[in-house]
């Protein structure tokens, strides 16, 4: 790596409040649901926990950051665009205001669309944080290059992550440990962008056969996964003979075309970049954040029998109602 050339820049943001939109979100199974979604401080889900089948939509584990400052020059959202661009997976994050001042965590991913940077903290720290607390990130990773593997592009990855990940070179091929393979054909929301530096794109889980074949029901926050036939150098693209390795950053979704989000980390031709199966290839293990819970397979929320909402009762005719004494 070109470690001597890299520049470390402090960037920051505030803990984002959850956003309220339409009261219901209609799932790809036709069922409307009311669920927690993006933003806020998620107290009981963090890196290493399952991300499929939760009673939530696009759940962001740990803390979601944005920067709502306004600059006198450039676009109005310039500070937040810089935050989501500069921050890289594995960067150190430090709380600089509020009761948790001085506590540290780690950047675990970026969520495009809502444009949040996600940070993991220990549970006892999460409960001391407040909405609006400021967090500063020691960003390092922009401009990172693999000098011995120029055909492979590094994106959104800190040098610390690549040093800890146990990447192995054999016969000129870089082997990257991953928990799952994902076919590029089922990637959804996030396609159509001209950069892969500012977010993620989603794995669709609606097809049960594909889900079972690739064991996608067992995905966890922080899992390293390989998207096969995908080139992310200049935005997410389907390209045969290429592979993109990334990290699961947010949870499943009931919305059509959406699902667990992947922030790209490495992208290159398969003859130079090769995924290898490693059940514990998760940020929780790579950085020693916590013991990794056993992987179990879960069904997505959409497609399950409706429980308490969303199921329309069979209409009752006036004649039947009269016979029952209702008229």
Language-model regions, residue ranges each:
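Epigenetic methyl-mark regulator signature
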Residues: 1-2
């Amino acid at each position: 790596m070109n470690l001597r050339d890299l520049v470390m820049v402090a960037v920051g943001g505030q803990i984002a409040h959850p956003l309220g939109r339409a009261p219901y979100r209609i799932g790809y199974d036709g069922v409307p649901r009311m669920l927690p979604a993006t933003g806020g401080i998620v107290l009981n889900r963090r890196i290493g926990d399952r991300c499929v089948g939760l009673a939530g939509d696009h759940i962001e584990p740990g803390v979601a950051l944005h920067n709502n400052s306004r600059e006198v020059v450039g676009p109005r959202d310039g500070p937040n665009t810089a935050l989501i661009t500069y921050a890289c997976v594995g960067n150190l994050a430090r709380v600089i205001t509020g009761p948790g001042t001085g506590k540290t965590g780690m950047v675990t991913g970026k969520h495009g669309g809502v444009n949040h940077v996600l940070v993991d903290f220990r549970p006892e720290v999460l409960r001391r944080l407040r909405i609006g607390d400021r967090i500063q990130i020691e960003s390092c990773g922009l401009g990172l290059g693999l000098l011995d593997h120029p055909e492979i592009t590094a994106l959104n990855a800190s040098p610390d992550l690549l040093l800890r990940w146990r990447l192995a070179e054999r016969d000129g091929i870089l082997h990257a440990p991953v928990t799952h393979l994902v076919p590029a054909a089922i990637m959804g929301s996030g396609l159509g962008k001209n950069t892969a530096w500012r977010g993620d794109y989603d794995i669709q889980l609606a097809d049960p056969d594909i889900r079972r074949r690739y064991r996608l029901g067992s995905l966890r926050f922080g899992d390293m996964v390989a998207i096969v036939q995908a080139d992310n150098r200049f935005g997410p693209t389907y390209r045969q003979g290429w592979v993109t390795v990334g990290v699961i950053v947010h949870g499943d979704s009931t919305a059509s075309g959406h699902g667990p989000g992947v922030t790209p980390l490495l992208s290159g031709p398969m003859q130079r970049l090769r995924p290898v199966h490693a059940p514990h290839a998760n940020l929780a293990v790579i950085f020693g954040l916590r013991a990794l819970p056993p992987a179990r397979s879960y069904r997505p929320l959409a497609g399950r029998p409706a429980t308490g909402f969303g199921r329309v009762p069979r209409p009752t005719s006036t004649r039947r109602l009269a016979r029952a004494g209702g008229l």
